[in-house]
Amino acid sequence: MKIIPIASESLGVRSLAVFVKVGKRGILIDPGAALGPKRYSLSPANSEMAALQLARSKIQEFAKKADVITISHYHYDHHTPFFEGIYESSSPEIAKELYSGKILLIKHPTQNINASQKRRAHEFLKNVEGIAKKIEYGDSKTFDFGDFKIEFSPPVPHGREGSKLGFVVMVLIDDGKKSVIHASDTQLINEKAVKWIIEKNPDLLIAGGPPTYLTHRVGNVRDIGRELINRIINETNAELIIDHHIVRDKGYEEFFNSLDKRPLTFAEFLGRENAPLEAYRKELHEFEKGKDVELPKGIVKFLKELGEQK
């Protein structure tokens, strides 16, 4: 089994897209990427837009290698919609190319879902039903592909218990030699999700971390997240990759270092330096105006790479 992180906050965009290769088969998990329309009351910087285009090209590239696509929920940073979206780098043509001929294993569109995601799921299915090879609802089900199995968790909260953001499904891929769980936007701050992860005891856990940049809205997720992630560290043998919401906070390193075992980000797993562009949106706008600002070296390096690709 080969695991390739594609896009995430440590790589400059909102995403948790991953490609898994098992033998000759490819599985693409949560193929979406987006930018926060507003952060610090600012629209995305030009460098964020460039990073989104890079993420989009990678998602499309890996989609060509995928037989199966899984979707944990219907937020646009986790699936690609069929509309022209500047902050999603989406269009009907892009979405059609992505999903055509694929086996889609997706979150149930009408059960354990909030109103917003139900509308999005309806629009998604309306467009994808004529082009996908097969569509199955994954919630609590296991799919046997011969040399590997894909198992879905029951629906769990998107964040804390009672979250207004609805529910997500986690996905476990097991080839008999190695297993990986993609825990999506559970944020590792609800008991139900963490209990399922511990029960399955994967070799690798990929998850979005607590949204510590939103404590003014969601409460003290820092302490809850630390407690529950430490439980996973101490009660499983899993290697941890944690990214997404937590890396929107400039203090993500401090949070990581407070855990019993420091996880990796997508960038670090790939041997790269972190480039959390959204967290530094203020500074990026100043930098793009030609002002002298201090940026993390990982961002400076990433910006140089983006410039070289133009």
Curated annotation (Swiss-Prot):
Which regions form coiled coils? none
**Which InterPro entries does the entry mention?**
Metallo-B-lactamas, RibonucZ/Hydroxyglut_hydro, UPF0173_UPF0282_UlaG_hydrolase, UPF0282_hydrls
Q: Which family does it belong to?
A: Belongs to the UPF0282 family.
What is the protein name for this chain?
Answer: UPF0282 protein PF0593
